[in-house]
Design a protein with these regions (language model features):
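Short helix/loop segments within enzyme catalytic domains
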Residues: 1-38
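Non-catalytic terminal regions of proteins
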Residues: 42-235
Length: 235
């Protein structure tokens, strides 16, 4: 559950790009580049199929994102599942027994499992909780059109920059600030468009370092040693 929560928060923070990164990383590392409709029963992480399904469900509910954009990403996630899923009508939760063999502990209809993901996303991201002042996580942090515009702008620049250049990290058209989430989302979008992974990764990391230097919290404390307090004394 904790890992599912982390995935949902990642999707709220950097938008559908988080779902793309989940999928490409997992599919690329799998032996046959397939998505399995099965998972080890004690695995704390949702399997690749469930992570893509969560990405789709969160994206569908991002009210601050244009509906056409949401629909396009939802269709993209559906196509990923259709292309890479080993065809199955069931989702299997298994354990390993002596000798390394797999024992199917629970077999759930795949449609029911995907419906469970829909309910899970609703409860984690969009249900108001007393523990956070009767707000939902999506009310506290959510990806919007403004974020998407910034991410696309930075992604476009990442695709055309040279090694010694950096993208424009100034404010967006509505004066919204660029945050690390925008750079992370932009890097994913850029790699999907043109898989020059080392170059785009380096540009993104250097952009994040630049944001780090500009951030008043992370750029360093005004008081480092006890003697520094004299510099800031009002007396």
């Amino acid at each position: 559950m904790n890992e599912a929560l982390a995935d949902v928060c990642g999707l709220l923070n950097i938008g559908p790009s988080a779902g793309i990164s989940f999928a490409t990383l997992a599919i690329g590392r799998s032996k046959n580049r397939n998505i399995e409709a099965s998972s080890y029963i004690d695995d704390p992480h949702p399997n690749t199929l469930l992570r893509i399904a969560m990405a789709k469900e969160v994206t569908k509910r991002l009210d601050g994102l244009d509906i056409k954009v949401r629909e396009a990403y939802s269709e993209f996630f559906d196509k990923l599942i259709e292309k890479y899923l080993n065809k199955s009508d069931s989702f299997i939760l298994y354990s390993t027994v002596e000798g390394g063999a797999k024992n199917s502990d629970y077999i759930v209809p795949l449609e029911s499992m995907l419906k469970t993901v829909e309910i899970l996303v609703e409860k984690i991201a969009f249900t108001r909780l007393r523990s956070i002042g009767n707000h939902s996580l999506s009310e506290i942090n959510s990806w919007t059109n403004r974020d998407q515009v910034l991410a696309h702008r930075i992604a476009t620049e990442l695709l055309h920059l040279q090694e010694n250049e950096l993208p424009d990290l100034s404010t967006g058209p509505d004066k919204q600030e660029v945050y690390s989430a925008h750079v992370a989302a932009a890097a994913v979008l850029a790699v999907v468009k043109k898989p020059e992974i080392p170059l785009i990764t380096d540009l993104a990391i250097r952009s994040l370092c630049e944001l780090y230097k500009l951030d008043p919290v992370w750029s360093g404390l005004p008081v480092w040693y006890r003697s520094d307090t004299e510099k800031h004394s009002p007396m």
